[in-house]
Amino acid sequence: MRTTPMANASTIERKWLVVDAAGKTLGRLSTEVASILRGKHKPTYTPHVDTGDHVIIINAEKIELTGKKLTDKIYYRHTQHPGGLKSRTALEMRTNYPEKMLELAIKGMLPKGSLGRQMFKKLNVYRGSEHPHEAQKPEVYELRG
């Protein structure tokens, strides 16, 4: 009897991919990177196994937002103290914390739970065009569209 082959930790081939964020739209870049982290671009995709590749995003400070989102979109965080709700606009986030801006967008598109946290660990975001992962011999990945 034939059975459908299921991926497991020992059969997964992981690659390192470099994505250049310069001039790309935040949401469109994030959806594609989240899909790569999940492994949905592979024929061996299995929902309950982390089959995704490692992704390195460079030039995070050059990410684009459409419309008036730079001034109107607000990122909230809480200090866990009474009255500790803090807010920043997308422009402040892109200027001071562009890595965090991309990480938050991608993390929201991954599964919630231990598997999603494991997938998120394979994401590396850097502000400039340099990254410390040359030893892994990453391949340049061109986004669709």
UniProtKB/Swiss-Prot annotation:
Keywords: Ribonucleoprotein, Ribosomal protein. The keyword GTP-binding does not apply. The keyword Ribosomal protein applies. It comes from the Bacteria. One of its GO terms (molecular function) is mRNA binding. Pfam families: Ribosomal_L13 (PF00572). NCBIfam families: rplM_bact (TIGR01066). This protein is one of the early assembly proteins of the 50S ribosomal subunit, although it is not seen to bind rRNA by itself. It is important during the early stages of 50S assembly. Part of the 50S ribosomal subunit. PANTHER family: LARGE RIBOSOMAL SUBUNIT PROTEIN UL13M, RIBOSOMAL PROTEIN L13. Belongs to the universal ribosomal protein uL13 family. This is Large ribosomal subunit protein uL13. It comes from Bacillus velezensis (strain DSM 23117 / BGSC 10A6 / LMG 26770 / FZB42) (Bacillus amyloliquefaciens subsp. plantarum).
